[in-house]
Amino acid sequence: MPLPTLLTKRAGSRLLAAAALLLSAVGVGAAAAAPAHALDYSSYHLAGVTGTGLHNTYDDKAEYTYLANALDTGTSLVELDTWANALNGKWDVSHSDPLASVNNCVQASSSADIYTGDRNQNLDSCLDDIRYWLLAHPTSHPIMVKIEMKNGFGSWSSQSPTAFDTYVQTHLSGVVYTPADLLTKSDGSLYPNLDAAATANNWGNYASLEGKAIVEIIPGTYEQAVSSSSTWVDQVYAQHLIDLYNSGEISQAAVFPSVLGAQTGDPRLRYSNTALRPWFVVFDQDAGAFVSDGATEWYNTNHYLAVVTDAYDVTPALSSSAPSLADAQARVALLAADGASYVSTDWYNSPGDGVLSEVLPRG
């Protein structure tokens, strides 16, 4: 089916912003003081709400001794940075070391283990920590696991898209929401691609996805600096999805490739291989660029997931790490009104961290 036509940004953007601020002042404050489930989830799908998250969650070791401590904030998004280790074929998790893991993940074999033990573990342990935390919190709202694949997929057989699927499915066993889940209709048949499924709003009901994780992958900074865009993980994995779908093996897919970076119009038009475009329904972009795009409601109207980063960097800029709670709430409300699905922040300091458990209606 053809991709949806872009809508122009709704008139009266200043009224929308004012409404967002009013929501923050009146409704969101009450929501922040109440349990995370103050919102009646039964009438919303996954694409109908906005959650708040933590940028580079694995790297905040001073603020969150363990990854589980970050999850305890009620965050709707955690971020992991992976390196395909060329020496041993493993997936390291660190910000800048391509040959070692530097993070707050531990080796756990049960939910009792996620707050103890040696940190600086590989990706499998980070995913295990998330899984065990979710199993211990089965009524938690769904968690978006954002993975920046710093140097892309690796040269080892254990670092291919197929192997990565198995890896994620194994370590998030029983809790991961997959592309096949989105594609499958109520009668068991499949939509022809992810775009058709998303625009039909076939995402699961938000309440039914409690205790689940959804994984997006984006191209990494190193990969972008040294490789042709045609080899980046977004395009490689989108082609992988097509191959799995055509072979009747789409149930093996574990993650959603994300279009990285905002631009005016449909960002998928950058892909010269038009067959890839309908396999992207997750978008990841800077909050400032997202707001200035001019058509943010397009993401919401078509039920795409929009992850926005650096929430502080929208005019007027806020503190990047410790805004007032009122300012943080107003910013999240504004981005929710503008159609963001997940608002990524570095607000791990009080009082701004009080916003992390918020889940708001989107749009």
Q: Language-model features: where?
A:
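Catalytic cores of phosphodiester-bond hydrolases, prominently lipid phosphodiesterases
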Residues: 39-363
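Secretory targeting and sorting signals
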Residues: 1-38
